[in-house]
Amino acid sequence: MAVQQRRSSKHRRDKRRSHDALTAQALSVCQKCGKKKLFHRVCSCGMYGDLRVKKAY
């Protein structure tokens, strides 16, 4: 296993970690029931846009 040759500075460490932040998922609102859903996914009520694609239970 590799061993580091020199200690990394705080600046270099933080620059490396600058791309590690997570972003929240973008959500849309169902036109029929008003629930939040992911884009390009079928809503839990069974609607995909203005098409009914599955039965709601």
Curated annotation (Swiss-Prot):
GO biological process, one term: translation
Renumbered residue ranges of the record's region Disordered: 1-21
Biased composition annotated in UniProt, kind: Basic residues: 7-18
InterPro entries in the cross-refs: Ribosomal_bL32, Ribosomal_bL32_bact, Ribosomal_zn-bd
Domain of life per record: Bacteria
Swiss-Prot/TrEMBL keywords: Ribonucleoprotein, Ribosomal protein
Entries under Pfam families matching the protein: Ribosomal_L32p
Gene Ontology annotations for the cellular component aspect, listed alphabetically: large ribosomal subunit
Keyword Ribosomal protein annotated: yes
GO MF entries: structural constituent of ribosome
Family designation: Belongs to the bacterial ribosomal protein bL32 family.
HAMAP family found in the cross-reference section: Ribosomal_bL32
UniProt-listed PANTHER family: 50S RIBOSOMAL PROTEIN L32, LARGE RIBOSOMAL SUBUNIT PROTEIN BL32
This protein's name: Large ribosomal subunit protein bL32
